[in-house]
Amino acid sequence: MSDTLRRLGEVLESRKLANGGDPEKSYIARLFHKGDDAILKKIGEEATETVMAAKDARAAGMTDEARGKVVYEVADLWFHTMVLLSHFDLTPDDVVNELARREGLSGLEEKALRKSQARDAAGD
């Protein structure tokens, strides 16, 4: 995992209310204080902004400026997703490990496996 993601994960942990994060002084601590709905709302907003930036970039002919806007919005989305992970006591490593688990497994195989597991769990 990149050092940047690791450091960001550490900052997020330090902003938790239990670790002394102050909602009056820290945007991250304020999100933690507001809870799940506030964090999820931000993720929804950032996901929508990412979609719009991507559509705009394609319409603009993938100029450097438009591509930069996509990167900017994806960074916001990643950031707020990492806030959610931290809020749920998960880390970027948990996501990296899941991606590693999926490596070499086609999307179609993954989908079929999930369907099979769901049927097994339902007792079918």
From Swiss-Prot:
Q: What is its EC number?
A: 3.6.1.31
Q: Which GO terms describe its biological process?
A: L-histidine biosynthetic process
UniProt keyword Glycosyltransferase present:
no
Annotated pathway:
Amino-acid biosynthesis; L-histidine biosynthesis; L-histidine from 5-phospho-alpha-D-ribose 1-diphosphate: step 2/9
Keywords assigned by UniProt, alphabetized: Amino-acid biosynthesis, ATP-binding, Cytoplasm, Histidine biosynthesis, Hydrolase, Nucleotide-binding
Please state which protein family the record places this protein in: Belongs to the PRA-PH family.
Instruction: List where in the cell it is found.
Output: Cytoplasm
Q: What is this protein called?
A: Phosphoribosyl-ATP pyrophosphatase
Look up the record and report any one GO term of the cellular component aspect. cytoplasm
Q: Which Pfam families match?
A: PRA-PH (PF01503)
InterPro entries assigned to the protein according to its UniProt record, in alphabetical order: HisE, PRib-ATP_PPHydrolase-like
Q: Which gene encodes it?
A: hisE
Q: Which HAMAP family match?
A: HisE
The family database entries (NCBIfam families) matched by this protein are listed as: histidine_hisI, PRK00400.1-3
Spell out the molecular function terms from Gene Ontology: ATP binding; phosphoribosyl-ATP diphosphatase activity
Q: Which Gene3D superfamilies match?
A: MazG-like
Catalytic activity field? 1-(5-phospho-beta-D-ribosyl)-ATP + H2O = 1-(5-phospho-beta-D-ribosyl)-5'-AMP + diphosphate + H(+)
